[in-house]
Amino acid sequence: MSNSQLWSCWCGCIRAIMICLWVIAFIAIAGYAKAVPPKALPNIVVILADDLGYGDVSSYNPTQGKIPTPQIDRIASGGMRFLDAHSASGCCSPTRYSLLTGRYHWRTRLQGGIVGVWEKPLIAKERLTIAGLAKQHGYATACVGKWHLGWDWSISEQERQSLKNFGGQAGGGGKVKTEATKEQVEVWKEIFSRTIQGGPTSRGFDTYFGTDVPNWPPYCFIENDRCVGIPSVLLPASALKKNQASLQGPALPQWELDAILPALADRACSVIKQQAQTQKPFLLYLPLTSPHTPIAVSKEWQGKSSIEHPYADFVMQTDAVVGRILDAIEEAKVADNTIVIFTSDNGCASYIGVKELEAKGHFPSGPLHGYKADAWEGGHRVPFIVRWPNNVAPNTTCQQTICSVDLMATIAEVLGVKLPDDAGEDSVSLLPLLRGEDRPIHEAVVHQSCPGILAIRSGPWKLIFGPGTGKVDNSKRLLYNLADDLGESKDLSMEHPEKVNELTNLMRRLIVQGRSTPGEKQANDVRVRFDPGNPR
């Protein structure tokens, strides 16, 4: 063999060896890259307070607030406060739907009001939720707290009769009763021994522990798809004293309303501790039951507030629960890789004694007009705080308009994935804002009062298609420039008819398109109730 042939052979061997080494290296790198993302992805903890007003958080209301919230402010000092953040609705279930799906609730059957007692699920089984999205990408997902989005209760029409005509502070369709009949109790035992379908564990969550609604039956905890214990006594009306919007119904013997919030805190801390010990990132959705009625303040927190009001005590207890969650994250040594999001489902409820609070110098809506259920800002402008160490600058604020629907797109971008066209139709990622950009991310944000009055916000302009509070009335339209009039004191609809027409047409387009973000046109579940009418 000649020298040239030997050299050629030698070079061929070297090339073959190099190729083998490159293949081995590629396989190793590919395997490593595949293994790294699940570990590197941040944990996500979403804390949703219930009926906590914009002015109930001390960092949002330093001059007109009298309730200290040091633990919520602790999140703010380590992250970003959004000053123009909104829930999708002025009340409960609609906001929960929108937060979990990234889609406005008024695209569903819920054109007004909330999901009722024993009602079917509002989230369609095939609808992607933030939990389902996270689960697709290797997350363990848990929900601890108030669900209030409906279940597939296995209850026949005949059995439903045993659950009707009980009273309470909100009426409930009947007078207050002192006890249930023997026949009713037997039916209850049968109903609540069955599995309950259609809840959180069928909507993307691996586990669930909580109460469906703390002021409605059944008065028991639900774990995954079963009641914890069998509600077999009638909750006495005395337990609901001074707790508006609460109903009598089946309860566990010795059920204590003031034990609910501590139990949820215990379970949430346990979830964090357990999940932090695994190789999986986790998403914890913690919809608290407070400070919503029943104002069930634990004994240790009664009388703690300086203004001597049970609601103030309950807000302070709620704040302490937030502190327990933050402590659990730190004790589990995952704080540096955990996104904490804190917000509220709507504004403070006027019926908890707002006039007394304001007389004592505490204004639950701060500088805003209105309260829970309203289309006014006080109904849906809420605290919204995000902490993400090494990603979000501490102690910062953002003035851009955002909404609770934005969690879906935000989480998708954190995961590095693109949402399908039929998911998160109204959601826009907050990451640009969290990284310090200062620009509008929404063409418009839509609000709705609890009765069903729609309102649209674009830039500083807000158009309410009816009165700011109370029943739907198509004869009214109210236009405000919030940059000049945050308190919504001067209606500009007569002075700027062109802006009224512009925003009305924009609202129509958002309805017809089935989405408010770029993407393929989608269908609403029902015909959206929108009739601007002929305003006077």
Where are these regions (language model features)?
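Bacterial N-terminal signal peptides
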Residues: 16-29
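N-terminal secretory signal peptides that target proteins for export/translocation
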Residues: 1-14
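Formylglycine-dependent sulfatase
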Residues: 11, 31-478, 482, 486-536
